[in-house]
Amino acid sequence: MIDSDGFRANVGIIICNKFGQVMWARRFGQHSWQFPQGGLDDGESVEEAMYRELYEEVGLRPEHVQILTSTRSWLRYRLPKRLVRQESKPVCIGQKQKWFLLQLKGHDNTINLNSSGHPEFDDWRWVSYWYPVRQVVSFKRDVYRKVMKEFASTTLALQTREFSKKRSKQRS
């Protein structure tokens, strides 16, 4: 779904663990790393697209995650001219994205990069919260910065809650 301004509707997914680290994935056969993302199909809600992409890209189902929050508005980035396919109609000049912050409820082994048979990623790791902002390709950096800033208080609350649990156990 490309809007009248040339932006493709898309969902972005940040998966965090109970320590506030985020899942960082390497694109299949490339050296670039990013968060899972993907376009909306016709007639699909944003949440339906998020769950579909979540399964297609990292093999997780709704029962494996908890939605913590989502962005208040759509965020946009433009593609570099070299990546715009002028021959396709309508021409897509970039992405407009609704982002979700999810917490993995299960174990790391529930992540399966080959769940769809056409993997988007060939490796993944947990990284510190702000790491992706410095590492993502430059044309996505501003969107990543905005998303991470919007979600920061939620992940900080996760980290604080986990730290408090550890201290309580140590005192017992």
Curated annotation (Swiss-Prot):
Gene3D superfamilies attached to this UniProt entry: Nucleoside Triphosphate Pyrophosphohydrolase (3.90.79.10)
Requisite cofactors: a divalent metal cation
Pfam (any one): NUDIX
Gene Ontology terms: biological process: mRNA catabolic process
Domain Nudix hydrolase as annotated: residue spans: 6-149
Short motif (Nudix box): ranges: 38-59
GO cellular component term, pick one: cytoplasm
EC number of the protein: 3.6.1.-
UniProt keywords, alphabetically: Hydrolase
Entry-linked CDD domains: NUDIX_Ap4A_hydrolase_plant_like (cd03671)
InterPro entries attached to this UniProt entry: Nudix_hydrolase, NUDIX_hydrolase-like_dom_sf, NUDIX_hydrolase_CS, NUDIX_hydrolase_dom, RppH
Molecular functions (GO terms): mRNA 5'-diphosphatase activity
Family: Belongs to the Nudix hydrolase family. RppH subfamily.
Protein name, as recorded: RNA pyrophosphohydrolase
Species this protein is from: Shewanella frigidimarina (strain NCIMB 400)
Biological classification of the source: Bacteria, Pseudomonadati, Pseudomonadota, Gammaproteobacteria, Alteromonadales
